[in-house]
């Protein structure tokens, strides 16, 4: 299925895909320039998230970033012809992407240098038969939870709908991205007068409390401020304007995508919050944005990847879908996607299976999924010794139960990359009495057995509709990853 959409390319301020370092003889000016680099990268990241309301949009935007840097898209169902120095990428389901760069020298390739993030974030997915009416007045959207979001953060804020449409055309079924780019709906709270116990804690029922209000089906857009009864309207039908077709989600999506509603045979639509990311804090030292988990890491990986040239390793950048719901899909980390692509790379370079296995044995994976920073109001929730902070640099994550793949050797490698890039790093481990979440690393390495480290960028309010992170940390990740991918 081919995706068709017009998506702006995310670029640096100078219009290129590459960053130019500025150096002067004035240490004060150098410090200003370094701070400007941090802010510029953070702003680019926020813009990337703004134009990526769903996993489909994120992957399409990553594709645009890759193509701006000279990458060629390959289709999995076609034969590949790979060349030394080639820069390639392929997508699966329009929601996962793997890019790779082959060194200029084919002889002496040592292995794969890989990093992975994910394209999805917790949100509400819109069900089939998406519209529910209440007492012939309200039109609600029929939704379900996608991932483990903080439910209360989705209430009483402007929301909209985006995703992918499956459109029938003369050549079969075509995927079409859609984003209803306006304040469209809201999930309203119950007033405190109707629930006096609300501030003591509310357990939200997703089928009852969390359905978005989309429209008033009784609304007359010709005479919105006049009330008249149905009998009077019927008696004076000839004097009334022609009835307007009531708004529906499919009609809105079709209009936005520029297709006939009758040609839409399937949808993958999600709610997203309309709040745009911004820098906040007394000195602009924080970033506030939806979907920082994990589009902050996905952006940092892509930016570093497009600005790197390998020497002895094949560089690989993977952004998987469905991490928030277990990764168990054909486009998730718990699939053969990564393994399939690595094997096809080896075949395209005429490497035999023994050579491929030797490459895998000398490979390394960085799994990048954001990490919990120490919370200012609840510092006791963090481990007493491993305490990452916003703007403190890359977080190396450890777990005795192997939910994170980090071990002593892989941690040492990551620390070395950070030190060579002059990037600070921190460590994270769960409190021993608090269970943590899972991520990509151990799932990916179950299919491709390589040494791996789990890292993340520190953030607060993970899985909230809007999350908080450090302004400096995206640039820190870019610098460390460029060091890794430069080998």
Positions of PLM-derived features:
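N-terminal hydrophobic/helix-forming segments and targeting peptides
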Residues: 2-14, 18-487
């Amino acid at each position: 299925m081919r995706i068709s959409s017009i998506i702006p390319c995310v670029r640096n301020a100078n219009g290129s895909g590459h960053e130019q370092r500025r150096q002067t003889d004035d240490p004060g000016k150098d410090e200003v320039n370094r701070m400007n680099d941090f802010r510029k990268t953070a702003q680019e990241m926020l813009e990337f998230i703004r134009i990526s309301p769903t996993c489909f949009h994120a992957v399409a935007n990553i594709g645009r970033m890759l193509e701006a840097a000279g990458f060629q898209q390959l289709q999995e169902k076609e034969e590949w012809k790979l060349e030394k120095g080639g820069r390639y990428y392929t997508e699966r389901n329009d929601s996962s992407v793997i890019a790779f760069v082959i060194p200029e020298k084919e002889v002496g390739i040592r292995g794969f240098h890989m990093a992975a993030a994910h394209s999805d974030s917790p949100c509400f997915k819109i069900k089939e038969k998406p519209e529910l009416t209440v007492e012939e007045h309200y039109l609600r959207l029929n939704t379900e939870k996608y991932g483990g979001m903080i439910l209360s953060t989705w209430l009483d804020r402007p929301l909209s709908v985006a995703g992918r449409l499956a459109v029938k055309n003369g050549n079969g079924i075509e995927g079409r991205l859609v984003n209803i780019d306006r304040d469209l709906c809201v999930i309203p709270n119950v007033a405190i007068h109707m629930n006096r116990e609300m501030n003591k804690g509310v357990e939200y029922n997703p089928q009852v409390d969390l359905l978005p209000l989309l429209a008033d089906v009784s609304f007359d857009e010709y005479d919105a401020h006049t009330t008249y009864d149905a009998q009077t309207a019927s008696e004076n039908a000839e004097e009334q304007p022609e009835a307007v077709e009531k708004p529906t989600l499919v009609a809105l999506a079709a209009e936005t995508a520029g297709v006939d509603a009758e040609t839409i045979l399937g949808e993958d639509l999600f709610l997203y919050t309309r709040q745009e990311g911004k820098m906040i804090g007394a000195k602009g030292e924080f970033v506030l944005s939806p979907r920082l988990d994990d589009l902050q890491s996905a952006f940092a990986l892509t930016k570093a990847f497009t600005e790197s040239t390998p020497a002895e390793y094949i560089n690989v950048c993977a952004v998987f879908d469905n991490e928030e719901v277990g990764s168990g899909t054909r486009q998730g980390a718990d699939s053969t996607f990564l393994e399939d692509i690595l094997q096809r790379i080896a075949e395209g370079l005429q490497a035999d299976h023994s050579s491929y296995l030797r490459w895998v044995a000398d490979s390394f994976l960085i799994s990048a999924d954001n990490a919990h920073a120490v919370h200012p109001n609840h510092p006791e929730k963090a481990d007493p010794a491993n305490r990452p902070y916003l703007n403190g640099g890359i977080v190396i994550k450890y777990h005795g139960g192997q939910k994170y793949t980090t071990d002593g050797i892989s941690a040492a490698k990551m620390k070395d990359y950070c030190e060579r890039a002059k990037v600070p790093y921190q460590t994270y481990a769960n409190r021993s009495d608090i269970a943590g979440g899972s991520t990509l690393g151990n799932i990916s390495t179950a299919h491709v057995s390589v040494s791996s480290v789990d890292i993340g960028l520190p953030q607060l309010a993970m899985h909230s509709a809007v999350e908080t992170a450090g302004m400096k940390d995206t640039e820190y990740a870019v610098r460390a990853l460029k060091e890794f991918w430069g080998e």
